[in-house]
Amino acid sequence: MKKIQLFLLQFLLISITQHTNAQLPVKTEYTVEMGGTSGKGTYAPMWLTANRQGLSSANTENGYLRAGIAHTMPLNQHFGFSAGLDLATAYNFTSSFIIQQAYADLSYRWLNLSIGSKERLPELKNSKLSSGGMVESNNARPIPQIRLEVPDYVAIPGPHKWLHLKGHIAYGRFTDDKWQEHFTSIGNPYTIDVLYHSKSLFAKVGNKEHFPVEFEGGIQMSAQFGGDQYIAGQKEPVIDMPTRFVDFMRVLVPMAGDDTTPEGEQVNIYGNHVGSWNFAATAYLNRWKVKIYYEHYFDDHSQMFFQYGRWKDGHIGLEITFPKNRFIDTFVYEGLGTKDQTGPMLYDSFWGKFEEQISAKDNYYNHYLYQGWQHWGMGIGNPLLPGPIYNKNGQITFISNRVLAHHIGFCGSPCQSLSYRMLLSYSRHWGTYDNPLNEIKKQFNSLFEVTYAPQQLKGWSFTVSGAMDRGNLLGNNYGGMLVIRKQGIIKSGNK
């Protein structure tokens, strides 16, 4: 892990010294949006809620009004600045006023420093059609953070520029303290003042101008740390996690906690860490583009490498981009498996009589101290593992993380002003190893969406969506959604 961190630092230095920043025009853009959902059932259909950057609601009747502004400008040949503010007021959401985005970015050549809350998309996947990333997707609200990043691939000097790198390091804070206090039922735990950390390093090998196949691969890791755990109904915290400088280092380079942390942190790693290895190969075949990808999720060291043999859990995908036609633009198929989790047994020699360690029963997305890998009730990872927002028992956990699922998404543009999108998902759920469901639950989720952007009304778009859930996990739900959006440029030109 230390070698990965040193390599990332060297890469950032290379990106600063070897590349120049493109001169961007001064631009100020605005967006005003209104959306409403109406449905029948226990919840709003999943695909009317999932992968919408957390600006959504599981309630059958809900709506929002949103307004945002973004400004971009160059400071000189190498420096650039951008900032944005995106606010919403909502009905039947987890909060009635939402600061969706509030950020300021300072870029130097290809290096970017981002401060604040900003919407981001999963790595290597089609955010419009994919079911989402395993570690972080676009399912939950953005987490405010300080982020040092190379957001786009940077070519490393060499013949034909075959090697490209990108990556980031970030620290932030979760913002759902009040929601957790309100949602958690008496006697159940919740944790507030929780801090956030993430990092990634990705490489791309190839140059499609010289060879029609490119390969991508990388690692991303995120963590929850710090914070105070409470039991609902009690005033004093039961666990107070330290947040000293050394603790920030312990999540940067994952290490065990000291005697100021609970025993679980001393035996394992300080904080709740999640991560994944990501691989993709993209072929450019005349006017076709075909990508295959694989994301291997790990919740601890047992699945980070090959300690317990071959990887059995993962997220595989196929994405096909078609030559321009009226019927279909892009097709995505994905298969998801999280059922193994290294096996059903966990044994820590710290508390036992035997020296052997069995690091299984990984319990994806759940944690004894931070409850779940979630923000405002929505899972930060893949939404096919439903988040705590769906729990009736007032617990901030994932009730089913052992899942096998298939997912299909496709979209098209029959004409210049009309486009469509369709999502179809089928999943089977076993619950968790500790709390298995009394039977295998099956769930089907679907979405059909049409967007009309009339040429005579520049900047306006109207999106109508219909969705349906059928099954015995989330139930049978039906609903429709209407979104009206106006986008435009307030100012544009050279500095």
Feature-to-residue mapping (PLM):
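Bacterial Sec-dependent N-terminal signal peptides
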Residues: 1-26, 492-495
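Exposed, low-structure sequence patches enriched in small/polar residues
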Residues: 3-4, 213-223, 228-495
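Beta-barrel outer-membrane channel/assembly domains of diderm bacteria
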Residues: 20-120, 127-130, 134-153, 161-165, ...
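Short loop/turn motifs that connect adjacent beta-strands in outer-membrane beta-barrel proteins
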Residues: 23-28, 71-82, 94, 107-111, ...
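Transmembrane beta-barrel strands of outer-membrane/channel proteins
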Residues: 28-41, 81-89, 106, 113-119, ...
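Sequence/structural signature of outer-membrane beta-barrel proteins
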Residues: 37-39, 86-92, 118-134, 155, ...
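Extracytoplasmic loops and strand-loop junctions of Gram-negative outer membrane beta-barrel proteins
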Residues: 50-53, 86, 129-132, 182-187, ...
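Internal, well-ordered domain-core segments that constitute the primary functional module
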Residues: 121-234
